[in-house]
């Protein structure tokens, strides 16, 4: 699994297995076959495409949008959780605001 501990400027496309312990200053898009493990912070939105997977253990200040993949939230999402398809699981103790 690829890991990043620093700060990433701009948007990020994930099509592999990627663990972010640092900060992404832009949006993150998780594509088919990609798996994001967000332990740090995303200052934008997280968009999960069909076949993608995102696990949010840390903080997302924007929206988390499931467009047909798998989303699991254990951390905090300041924006909205938008379920447009796929499977979305909010674990007990997660801090979120839901929008169907």
Question: Model-predicted segments: where are they?
Answer:
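Extended beta-solenoid/beta-helix repeat architectures
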Residues: 1-100
């Amino acid at each position: 699994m690829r890991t990043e501990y620093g700060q990433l400027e701009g948007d990020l496309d994930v099509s592999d297995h990627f663990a972010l312990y640092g900060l992404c200053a832009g949006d993150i898009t998780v594509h088919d076959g990609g798996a994001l493990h967000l332990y740090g912070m995303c200052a934008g939105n997280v968009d999960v495409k069909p076949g993608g997977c995102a696990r949010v253990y840390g903080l997302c200040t924007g929206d988390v949008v499931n467009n047909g993949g798998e989303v699991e939230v254990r951390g905090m999402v300041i924006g909205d959780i938008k379920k447009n398809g796929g499977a979305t699981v909010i674990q007990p103790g997660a801090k979120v605001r839901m929008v169907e």
